Amino acid sequence: MTRIFGTDGVRGLANGQLTAELALDLSVAAARVLADRGEFKGHRPLAVVGRDTRISGQFLEHAVVAGLASAGVDVLRLRVLPTPAVAYLTEALGADLGVVISASHNPMPDNGIKFLARGGHKLDDAVEKLIEQHLAEEWDRPVGGDVGRVTPYATPVEEYVAHLVGTLTRSLDGIKVVLDCAHGAAYEAGPRALRAAGAEVVAIAVEPDGLNINADCGSTHLAALQAAVVEHGADVGFALDGDADRCLAVDHEGNAVDGDQILAILALGMAETGHLAKNTVVATVMSNLGFVQAMRAAGVGVRQTKVGDRYVLEAMRVSGYSLGGEQSGHVIMSEHATTGDGILTALHVLQRMAATGQSLQSLASVVTRLPQVLVNVPDVDKSRADDDAVLAAAIAEEEAALGDSGRVLLRPSGTEQLVRVMVEAATQEEAVSVAGRLADVVKRQLAL
């Protein structure tokens, strides 16, 4: 059967590919699979459900809750809450299942459903495949007192904020911050957490109306944040995405600071305090070569994985690493979280600034980025990207010419019908030239 789950749960156009019926069926199937695996043995099963601010999240939440309750699962409704907050409360409340209704940084018309296992971790691929296999199957429905109870949870934001602030060891007093919440799930928790930690906060994009999530704001559109940091004379700015599982930054002059630089700042700070497990940071193959070189020069090891925060987290869990992340701003600090957490990331970058007395610009300068060009090639057969001999030969030829001063990465998208061509080189012109040539080969060889 066609896969429904992508690299980050189920995503699609709300009320298009992702309907209320599918949301209900997925929830029932998830409950059945976990029950068959013995996850609910000896107790009434419990799930927590949260969502972002998209207008479609309301009907999808009702469908998910209905599916779970009809399968005999008690449900705590967390309402609008960041993805990492749902993950935290899944663990803190001892829930058997967490459900996040969000399409993260995607445009407003999209939405998604992501399931979290007990402990707040994303479900394994194998479990997601079982859920797909059980979709719309006939089953013995619970009746009477065996159906699930649905209860609004009273204090999700308060408990999450207390958890975040509790991870810090010093006050952020005296630091002025602009925080862009993307009109998304962190519009309440984000400013509250930074203020509770002592920072002076100017909050922008905190007026969600169901339609404006990620619209010209947040981590995918930094211009508003850059302007606000300069306008308010702030020390630093942070941009979250719609579900607040990622964070990018802006220094006091309005210059963007990406996930690689943020990861480097945190890695060096954790290494200094003895909290960087195995003195190694986990990144993906998309991380800039300049980041890898900076870490190795500082004596910090780098373990690289496939693209996707789930693969970063998998490497961290299997090998016992404490820090990992992506260039896009997903940062996982496993001592404090089970998934990427944008607010947590911002707090710990601010703590590093407070501890060193250095500006974000100074801290980020440890990474000298190589020029990087990313070209998305749409409407091609991405399934053939790894098997085409002509394309492989073209990549090998370009890599040989780049030598140690650059690299090529070709990657099929996990969520869209396109292939990404990434090139790093000694100069921007060379990177653009190589990426353009390879994009042309991709279009020609992988044409539909």
From Swiss-Prot:
GO MF annotation: an example: phosphoglucosamine mutase activity
Pfam families: PGM_PMM_I (PF02878), PGM_PMM_II (PF02879), PGM_PMM_III (PF02880), PGM_PMM_IV (PF00408)
Cofactor: Mg(2+)
Record PTM text: Activated by phosphorylation.
Domain of life: Bacteria
GO CC, alphabetical: cytosol
Binding site residues for Mg(2+): 104, 241, 243, 245
Phosphoserine found at: 104
Gene3D superfamilies: Alpha-D-Glucose-1,6-Bisphosphate, subunit A, domain 3, Alpha-D-phosphohexomutase, C-terminal domain
SUPFAM superfamilies: Phosphoglucomutase, C-terminal domain, Phosphoglucomutase, first 3 domains
HAMAP family linked: GlmM_B
Classification via NCBIfam families: glmM (TIGR01455), PRK10887.1 (NF008139)
Family per similarity comment: Belongs to the phosphohexose mutase family.
Role: Catalyzes the conversion of glucosamine-6-phosphate to glucosamine-1-phosphate.
Protein name (database record): Phosphoglucosamine mutase
Biological source species: Nocardioides sp. (strain ATCC BAA-499 / JS614)
Gene behind the chain: glmM
